[in-house]
């Protein structure tokens, strides 16, 4: 049956495209902003208790596992240098139906992360200025995120570079103060100690359990793939950016947690280990440093908010260009700013829901989508290279396209086992809604709309 709807939308030279302007360092900074480096302080008390004082060992183990998935992303972006991330990879490596469900599930993560950052900003600023109504902070913060993302992705990248450097600077000062404290007899009393990695109290199972928690700190390194169509030579630049984002993020997490663990060998000093950040800053640097440190956490949310707002706008753009969502709205690119302007505004409207959500419910929304994306990216490598392209003849092929994605998938499987029941329930409800919408698309078009772009893949050698 003939259908007039644009199921396979050919690239149209006259259409406004996203502006290709990002450099490698800008993409990496966007990725680090998405990771929010200072989250290491939020989880330290919890993970230190679970791992018996070996938080950096848990981060090291988590980084090793995450890198397998990062490598899978790198392989796929060379083949499909487009902005859809896991949605595009599953769509083209497995089939459009699976791709749609992966994209729909990923939206749960991408769409609500800007709102969570707005919610955190509201919490921080309301604590500092209790006389100001919370809605003022929500509206102001959303306006800033939306305006910056409307104007230019370069503007967002430059802001994020500044904000990430501010976070790293305050962490360097923190480490300096820790070293001073260690020389004065605090903690283990010396910088030259491997106790945070290995000691008589180190046991593999507690460290692995800690790793399953800190692994969630790495969620978002894949968001840089949504910037592929705004990065010249994306097939070569984006794989580097993915790997560097994961590695640099891991180095920051490991370094910060190492010095913290030397200063706090156990959690006995914390009144509330589950929310130890204010106490950590107070014990290490005093009241003034604590105030500065807490202000920097606001910068943390601003950086992550800008990056996540940009990422979800690009994912919606690709799904709109595919006509999975109405192309006239979601596939629109502003002719002057060269940004997906309507998507940016819609994400801003969703972020206003921070007025009504609490933090526990909001955070439960995001992990499901990220794990779906990670799982199917690893499966896509296997299906595209090993199965479909027949790259299964040599031991090298088996290593790159079977063993490595399998290890990546197993690592993600550990995270699935440790996913909170609330996240799983909300995720399954969201996936059910996506399944119903997919059924509607199939009934209407007889197949899922698919973009037939003009991107040329780079051979995997």
Curated annotation (Swiss-Prot):
It is a multi-pass membrane protein. Putrescine uptake is inhibited by carbonyl cyanide m-chlorophenylhydrazone (CCCP), which dissipates the proton motive force. It is found in: Cell inner membrane. It comes from the Bacteria. One of its GO terms (cellular component) is plasma membrane. Keywords: Amino-acid transport, Cell inner membrane, Cell membrane, Membrane, Symport, Transmembrane, Transmembrane helix, Transport. Changing residue 110 to X: The uptake activity is reduced to one-eighth of that of wild-type. This is Putrescine importer PuuP. It comes from Escherichia coli (strain K12). The gene is puuP.
